[in-house]
């Protein structure tokens, strides 16, 4: 069963739109990463500097490998100056029978 993941980017004031623009090119690589099934980008309607990704990966291990790769390539470090804190990553269990 696929792994659903929510990743929240808590951006500093005024940086949400810039992050969304940067994600347009960065997510090309994400979507090509092994096990990635989909990625959707949202901004909080009441707090536009809170950017949320809803991702589906074949398995949690695929997402963990992806996050390790993003760390190794320096992307997360590059984003640090526009974030107010660490990424918030939540793994969800699907209940397709409900």
Please tell me what each predicted stretch does.
Residues 1-3, 18, 34-36:
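Short, flexible segments with low predicted structural confidence
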Residues 3-9, 40-67:
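Short, well-ordered beta-strand segments in beta-rich or mixed alpha/beta enzyme
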Residues 10-19:
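Short, surface-exposed ligand-recognition loops at beta-strand->loop->(often short) alpha-helix junctions
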Residues 25-37, 56-89:
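An amphipathic, aromatic/His-enriched active-site/gating alpha helix that lines ligand/cofactor pockets
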Residues 43, 91-93:
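A general secondary-structure junction signal
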Residues 95-98:
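A short acidic, often aromatic-flanked loop/helix-cap motif at beta-alpha or helix-coil junctions
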